[in-house]
Amino acid sequence: MISSIGLDIGGAHLKACLIRNDPFIKLSKVALFKTPIWESQNTLVSTLEEIEKKWATGKDVQINIAMTAEMTDCFIDRREGVRKILSMIKNTYSYEKLKIYSTNGLKDFKITDKNYKEIASSNWHATADTLSKIERNCFLIDIGSTTTDIIPIQFGKILSPTSSTDFSRLQKGELVYLGVCRTSLSSIRRQLLFRSKMTNIIRENFAS
């Protein structure tokens, strides 16, 4: 088995791990990179290049990628986001190394944005699929920078269908737009105690 790099490309952060083909040290590296793509897409490009330079040395490394960054508001829509992120990845890594995660599992990187719906925001399924092999009956609660996923697992199976979209998951309560970094204060509270007085919160970005 070759060594693997896992990349979860989010809109605010890129999460990376390196798993080596080593009987003693499997999980070799874990890192969190700040990549505020809505401010500059170059933050993602430079981070991908840094990982390629420092981690992905040699031909025996496979790079597995999942993304949610296509939802960042610097893109016109989700399709454009997937297309541009795939382009950044293609310009950094060789095809031979790349696999991309879809809700139907890892795929070869010879894909286009025509099947972008399988790729877009599929990291929830990757996490749930991994957990289902460890805990047969549970709820997965994954709190990210922007959103929270709540995914039921029963008898080792993910109860959310692979065809689930963000829209259907929002309707079911499996996707909640609350996170630890990008959630505006005004969406959580109407008032806060400030200088010993309850004060109404301004519903503007600068107030957060």
PLM features: residue spans?
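Nucleotide/phosphate-binding catalytic cleft detector across ATP-hydrolyzing
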Residues: 1-11, 17-141, 151-208
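Conserved Rossmann-like nucleotide-cofactor binding loop
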Residues: 12, 146
